[in-house]
């Protein structure tokens, strides 16, 4: 990829396939690092099949019992009134669309359900609850979702329907029988609960129940078919199936193909040009805020370029980045391209990339440095670099903390997205030392019983580990400023994170600040921040091409 005077080589590694299981806090942001397209971004014809989406599709008219449909829509009207919800015409249209897919007598591809891919912040949860209530089924409904959203869904269901769902999670799993689950109106569970572990290969009680409806919220968790989660989801028995995600394509076209498999659409359909058109037009509901006329306060994005304050800090980062050779420098002279420096990666490239990111925020340990020294990476003694790290005075952390403290009295709640536990701890301590004491950390260390309390309370600053709290949370009431300490490999994760604030109910302009380190040596050696941005843009190209027809 050409970017200014540099040409970057983006290495194609699908880390979800290499390491499909949970990864440590030290490297959890790496799981979505590449996941590039199957065919490679350099192929001239990589998007040929996507271009065909622009053509008109011929789809048979669905056969729907209009009397049954209107009866269901009357149920929806009662639901809105009884739940004391604000009527929104686009949500009614969405519920009507969902019910028509469930009750049609000739569903395309034999799919009774579909993919709800409305833009983040439009209220997909309420839409789905409305559909569940409006078209009651004899068998129970199973909702599969990230563990962080269990309580939010349970509260929303009880608030709007007066019925408490059964939460199949934790100790509750031991109390269940097939009969007890079958007698529930709605059951909530997690993606890990439906997973079929490869070593055991055994199904669990959830796979024995005949579900009337299965709903996968944040369905992009199913994008990797090599995982036990995907296998377990595919094994569930159901009449209707719904996928809910505002980001159905995160890294590559195969993300969308795998969601089609969950809908049980044959590969012979979704991998053909005409089939892709028909799928998009018949089983996918995708609407943006602009399309439905929803006007929210603006999102103002600011990139904060951070200069290196310490030569020793910069030297440490340069040593590690030099070992990666992340760039191909190209120099043009007399219209002739000269030698392109070839990038060479060591066998532990993924760990090295993680270390390069950590070097920008001072999170390297003595063990990390000793390993790097053994590999011949460091130009100075470990002791000298440890002195730098122990000072906890790194340029990027300073920039983030100073920016937040400068705005501490402006009346806007602040969300700071981090990658590492230690990073969150340092930022919180520095903010407290600077007089901002009403701060809290939301990450995997926080007990589930405490998470609801943290989210309901208003804090001056909420520090969130991005993989823990980037999706599903409603934070628009208390927060309108977002700080990304570093870019994430997956741009959809950042989009989801911004949508925690920029959604229905937000009354303030949402300011987003992205912190990026300056390059290391006369702009010849890019930092990981710059490199991640290149990877992000390649992934956004895929998403834009797939959504072009929308």
What are these language model-derived features?
Residues 99-103, 125-139:
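Walker A/P-loop NTP-binding motif
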Residues 489-498, 502-550:
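A conserved SF2-helicase RecA2
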Residues 197, 251-252, 424-426, 451, ...:
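SF2 helicase motor core recognition
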Residues 68, 109-113, 119, 127, ...:
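Conserved Helicase C-terminal RecA-like lobe
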Residues 68-115:
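Conserved pre-motif I regulatory segment
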Residues 138-159, 420:
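Conserved Walker A/P-loop ATP-binding site and its immediately adjacent core
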Residues 188-189, 193, 203-208, 228-238, ...:
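Inter-lobe coupling linker of SF2 helicases/translocases
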Residues 120, 239-252:
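Conserved helicase ATPase motor motifs in RecA-like P-loop NTPase domains
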């Amino acid at each position: 990829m050409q970017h200014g005077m540099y040409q970057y080589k983006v290495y194609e590694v699908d880390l979800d396939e290499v390491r499909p299981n949970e990864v440590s806090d030290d490297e959890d942001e790496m799981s979505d690092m590449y996941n590039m397209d199957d065919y490679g971004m350099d192929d001239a014809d990589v998007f040929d099949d996507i271009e065909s989406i622009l053509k008109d599709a011929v789809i048979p008219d669905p056969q729907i019992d209009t009397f049954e449909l209107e009866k269901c829509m009357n149920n929806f009207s009662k639901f809105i009134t009884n739940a004391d919800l604000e009527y929104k015409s686009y949500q009614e249209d969405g519920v009507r669309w969902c019910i028509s897919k469930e009750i049609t007598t000739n569903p395309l591809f034999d799919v009774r359900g579909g993919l709800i891919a409305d833009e983040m912040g439009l209220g997909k949860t309420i839409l789905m609850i409305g559909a569940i209530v409006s078209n009651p089924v004899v068998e129970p409904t199973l909702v599969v979702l990230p563990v962080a959203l269990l309580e939010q869904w349970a509260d929303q269901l009880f608030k709007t329907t007066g019925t408490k769902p059964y939460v199949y999670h934790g100790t509750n799993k031991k109390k269940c029988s097939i009969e007890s689950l079958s007698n529930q109106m709605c059951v909530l569970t997690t993606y890990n609960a439906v997973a079929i572990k490869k070593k055991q290969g055994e199904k669990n009680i959830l796979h024995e129940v005949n579900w009337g409806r299965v709903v996968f919220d944040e369905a992009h968790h199913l994008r990797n078919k090599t995982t036990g989660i995907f296998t377990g989801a595919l094994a569930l028995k159901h009449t209707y199936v719904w996928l809910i995600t505002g980001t159905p394509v995160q890294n590559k076209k195969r993300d969308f193909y795998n969601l089609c498999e969950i809908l049980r659409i044959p590969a012979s359909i979704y991998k053909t040009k005409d089939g892709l058109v028909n799928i998009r037009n018949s089983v996918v509901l995708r609407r943006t805020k602009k399309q439905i006329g929803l006007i929210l306060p603006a999102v103002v994005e600011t990139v904060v370029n951070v200069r290196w304050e310490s030569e020793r800090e910069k030297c440490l980062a340069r040593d590690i980045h030099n070992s990666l050779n992340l760039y191909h420098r190209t120099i043009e002279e007399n219209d002739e391209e000269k030698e392109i420096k070839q990038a060479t990666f060591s066998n532990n490239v993924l760990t090295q990339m993680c270390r390069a990111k950590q070097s920008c925020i001072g999170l390297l340990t003595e063990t990390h440095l000793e390993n790097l020294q053994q590999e011949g990476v460091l130009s100075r003694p470990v002791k000298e670099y440890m002195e730098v790290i122990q000072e906890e005075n790194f340029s990027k952390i300073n920039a983030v903390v100073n920016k937040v403290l400068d705005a501490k009295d402006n009346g806007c709640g602040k969300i700071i997205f981090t990658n590492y536990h230690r990073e969150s701890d340092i930022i919180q301590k520095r903010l407290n030392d600077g007089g901002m004491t009403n701060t809290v950390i939301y990450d995997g260390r926080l007990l589930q019983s405490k998470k609801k309390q943290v989210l309901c309370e208003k804090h001056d600053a909420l520090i969130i580990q991005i993989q823990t709290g980037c999706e599903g949370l409603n934070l628009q009431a208390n927060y309108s400023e977002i700080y990304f300490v570093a870019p994430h490999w997956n741009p959809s994760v950042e989009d989801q994170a911004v949508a925690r604030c920029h959604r229905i109910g937000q009354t303030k302009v949402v300011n987003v600040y992205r912190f990026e380190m300056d390059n290391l040596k006369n702009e010849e050696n890019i930092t990981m921040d710059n490199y991640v941005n290149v990877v992000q843009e390649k992934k956004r190209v895929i998403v834009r091409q797939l959504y072009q027809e929308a």
